[in-house]
Amino acid sequence: MDIIGSGFIRFKYNYIIIIIINIIPELMPLKSVNFLIITSLYAWKIPK
């Protein structure tokens, strides 16, 4: 439960980062990096 909980918290924080990056155009190059982090966390969560 702790691992799943911490993963969910990380997912939420990365989602907030995505929103911030979408709002700030100067950080556009970081968008793809954070998208990869989100998708990898989400893909890691599905099998478990």
Curated annotation (Swiss-Prot):
Q: Name one GO cellular component term.
A: mitochondrion
Q: What is the superkingdom listed in this entry's lineage?
A: Eukaryota
Q: Where in the cell is it found?
A: Mitochondrion
Its name, as the record gives it, is Uncharacterized 5.6 kDa protein in COX1 intron
Provide the organism lineage as a comma list.
Eukaryota, Fungi, Dikarya, Ascomycota, Pezizomycotina
Q: Sorted alphabetically, which keywords does the UniProt record give?
A: Mitochondrion
